[in-house]
C-alpha cells in the first residue's frame, strides 16, 4: 500500500470533501437544493402533462347542441386518444374530430363531437325508415327528435377503408355526414370515455347495444 506524505494527505483530504464539520451544509445551500428539486418536479410535471394530452387523454368541452340529449352544451368529457389508435373505432363511439376540408369550420377551429354510425368498408343508407347498415336496420334509442319526426332524404354511402360516417344524436339540429359526407379517421382526436362535469351527470360513455342484426 502506498501512503501519502502528511502534507499531501491533508491536501487531498481538503480537495475531496474534507471533514463535514469544516464544510457545513448552510441554510443557503439547503434553500438552493430545495429550489432545484422544486424546479425539476415542476418541469417533469409539465412535460408529463403535455405528453398525456398529446398522446393519451385530453379534456374536451361540449360546445354544440348537436348531441342532445346525450350531451348538453357546457358539459365536459375526457377523450381517450390512445386506444382508438390500437383497436380502431366501434359503432356508437362518440368521437371528437377536427373538420376535414369538405366540412365547414369555425374561426377558432372548434372540434366537432358526433357519434360513429358507419365503419370502414360498410354501405350505409338512410331513408324514411331510418339508418341501414349493409341492409340491416339500425335501432337508435339515443336519437333526439326535438318534438319532430326523423324524415330523412334518401342517401347512401360506401365507406372507404379509412372513412367513418358520423351523425349527431339531435338529428334535426346537427351538421354531420348527411350534409358533408364521411370523415377520414385521421382527423379524429379521440373517443369520449367519461363525462366528468357536471358532477350530477358524471358517467362512463360506452357504445349502445345494437343487437345482433347489425354487427
Feature-to-residue mapping (PLM):
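Soluble "head" domains of membrane/secretory-pathway proteins
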Residues: 2-40, 51, 55-61, 68-215
Amino acid at each position: 500500500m502506498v501512503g501519502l506524505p502528511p502534507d499531501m494527505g491533508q491536501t487531498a483530504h481538503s480537495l475531496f470533501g474534507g471533514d463535514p464539520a469544516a464544510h457545513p451544509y448552510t441554510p443557503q445551500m439547503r434553500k438552493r437544493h430545495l429550489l432545484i428539486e422544486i424546479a425539476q418536479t415542476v418541469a417533469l410535471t409539465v412535460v408529463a402533462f403535455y405528453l398525456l394530452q398529446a398522446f393519451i387523454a385530453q379534456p374536451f368541452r361540449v360546445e354544440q347542441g348537436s348531441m342532445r340529449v346525450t350531451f348538453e352544451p357546457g358539459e365536459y368529457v375526457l377523450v381517450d386518444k390512445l386506444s382508438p389508435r390500437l383497436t380502431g373505432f366501434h359503432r356508437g363511439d362518440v368521437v371528437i374530430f377536427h373538420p376535414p376540408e369538405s366540412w365547414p369550420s369555425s374561426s377558432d377551429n372548434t372540434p366537432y363531437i358526433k357519434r360513429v354510425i358507419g365503419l370502414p368498408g360498410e354501405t350505409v343508407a338512410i331513408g324514411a325508415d331510418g339508418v341501414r347498415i349493409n341492409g340491416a336496420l339500425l335501432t337508435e334509442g339515443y336519437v333526439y327528435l326535438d318534438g319532430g319526426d326523423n324524415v330523412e332524404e334518401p342517401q347512401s354511402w360506401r365507406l372507404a377503408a379509412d372513412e367513418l360516417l358520423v351523425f349527431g344524436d339531435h338529428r334535426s339540429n346537427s351538421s354531420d355526414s348527411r350534409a358533408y359526407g364521411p370523415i377520414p379517421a385521421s382527423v379524429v382526436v379521440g373517443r369520449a370515455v367519461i363525462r366528468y362535469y357536471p358532477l350530477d351527470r358524471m358517467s362512463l360513455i360506452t357504445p349502445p347495444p345494437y343487437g345482433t342484426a347489425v354487427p
